[in-house]
Amino acid sequence: FLDNMLRDKKNHRIEEIVVPKNSWTIGKTLKDLNIKEKVGLQIIAILDPISQNYNYYPNATDTILENMTLITLGDSERIETLTKFIN
């Protein structure tokens, strides 16, 4: 899977995006953000900024925290859109 993804001309990659301090998304759930519908990406994991534990199966009810890391898989254009979306 990863070999094919890295060779794909569509420039897919796994990306970690940190939720900034003043993000409007803080305190909202993944369901509230509706990232899959609005941006076209799925959040495949999250890193809790307090415990430093990864959640590889994030739920729609998980709440966004300041400095939380969102891990996604997608093309560079959608990843850039997600970065702007959470800022």
Locations of the language-model features?
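Flexible, Lys/Arg-rich cytosolic regulatory linkers and terminal tails that connect or flank
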Residues: 1-24
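Cytosolic Rossmann-like ligand/nucleotide-binding regulatory domains
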Residues: 16, 21-86
